[in-house]
Amino acid sequence: MDAKLREDLFRRYVASLENRLEEGAAEGGGDRQGAKTEEALISTATALLGSYQADPGQRFRMLRFYDVVENSLRTQRGTSLRTVGTAFATLETICTNLLLFPWKKEYRCIKTFTGPYVYQLQSVLCDSDLRSLLRSMGYSREQELQYNVRDHPGGASHLRQLAFELLLAQAECRLLGEVVSMSRGFASELEAVELRRNTREDAAGCADALRRRDSLTGDLSRLSVRPLDIDRAHLRRSGRPSKSVDVTDSAGHWHQASKPVLKASLSLRKEPLFVDTEEDMKDEIIRPSPSLYPVAAPPSYSPVADFFPIQSPPSEPYSYHLSSLDEVDLYTERGLGGHQTPSRPPSREPRDSWVLKGHMMKCQGCGMGCPSLSSCQRCDMILCSSCHAVDPAPCCGFQDYTKTSRPLDGYMPIKEKLSVYSSAHSHTHPHPHPLPHAQSHSLLLDKAVMSSKLFPSKPVGSGPSPVGSLVSSGSSSSGGERLSVGGSRCGFCNKPGASHTCVNCSKVSCDTCMSLYASDLCTRKNPHHNFVPNHQLNFKSSTISHLVYR
């Protein structure tokens, strides 16, 4: 505001106060005319404050307007520029009443429990700012419930200047509201106050500055997010790209049209799925998982690769590998959708190695756990590498060790079983130790063949077998004790001939593993395994009407 215009407006304001005093002394009904005059003065002050000013600090000389408004908007709940303008209007009324009618007692005392003080001053302005403004008028709070006035050393001229700046404060609040409305929602009232404090622009210039600052803030926020978008660019899709045109997405990231993209499959396998980006994937929703970022690095842009795509075969059939099933996205991932998953090469691992992955096996020679175990070539006993290196071997290498390669409950290895059924009359055996009761092979073989002819619908393992007769004492009757053929495999070493079963966890075991794993945890309520021979289990099996093949 220009100094000359400010002085002219101040003279008009003082003249309106004198007219109000004369009309009030004459009739007491000049309130309506005074309100119209004050509204015209506020409109004029708003127009003058909204014009270009050389020095923003000359708007208010006795009043810390921007500090008071900023503290009010930050600390008081429900405060706005409109309520702050109402508070300044109330303070102006208090100041003009004290200026025009200093002899009236009702104007020399302010009660802190009255409605105007509580709802228009105390709930809007900070307590320290309110005390400072009332102290500048000459009021001091000697008691808790009221302010009392004392003669100010500045006199009437000081009160006139203060009342005039309170009028300018109302006009500035109205101007700030117009700036916020012209910014079209790009700025808040507090941002408008902070900008208006130091700017020399008019109201329209302040609104434009707020809009520019908001757009700049949005650009900076987008720039801060751009590195993450670059990392995810290799997982995005476009439509059907052309090999002769640079392929970009909506964010401006480059794609290599011929490079396969790694995706996780819904089949919960650990094999990757390579999808060509040239396929039509318009209906696919892409939400890359953060776990895929370290797997595949974002491709670097090369214009030569766009115009001359070169497809190099991968060095390995499976160069990417998902570390766990937790990295598979089950929510936004589509199915195979006609794309062929590369077939898994056949596994060359023996079946015994599958069992070794499940739990830590123990050596049957030393009883120690070892991750790498292998069976003996002569007696099929599972030994560790150290036991294999011992000469003679602890299984069948000692001459005084009476080794039988079958459990006590009727298991006979496959080699011996083949020798029994192939050459029943020739009692030769590949095992270095001869089998006991070898003279009864032909008789038991004939008995097994006859029983299979008489009872064709009976399961193989339900009746006595030549294998069971070989291990039994020979005095058992035909229906005496239940013998088991070595059909089930041990749950620890995966060898046939599981003769014992844990009654707690139902895990089957051979004789050798039963002694090794009897003290292990059972993973049930009982701490250790409780193995019982199979022929002592209390269960009844129903008769099966058909022949069971294993």
Curated annotation (Swiss-Prot):
Annotated ranges, domain PUB: 83-156
UniProt keyword annotations, A-Z: Cytoplasm, Necrosis, Nucleus
Record motif PIM motif, residues: 320-337
GO terms of molecular function: signaling receptor complex adaptor activity
Disulfide feature: none
GO cellular component: cytoplasm; nucleus
Gene3D superfamilies in the cross-refs: 1.20.58.2190
Pfam families registered for this protein in UniProt: SPATA2_PUB-like
Localization terms from the record: Cytoplasm; Nucleus
InterPro entries registered for this protein in UniProt: PUB-like_dom_sf, SPATA2_PUB-like
Region (Disordered): 457-480
GO biological process, one term: protein linear deubiquitination
Its job: Bridging factor that mediates the recruitment of cyld to the LUBAC complex, thereby regulating TNF-alpha-induced necroptosis. Required to activate the 'Met-1'- (linear) and 'Lys-63'-linked deubiquitinase activities of cyld.
Family statement drawn from the similarity comment of this UniProt entry: Belongs to the SPATA2 family.
Name of the protein this chain belongs to: Spermatogenesis-associated protein 2
Species of provenance: Danio rerio
Gene responsible for this protein: spata2
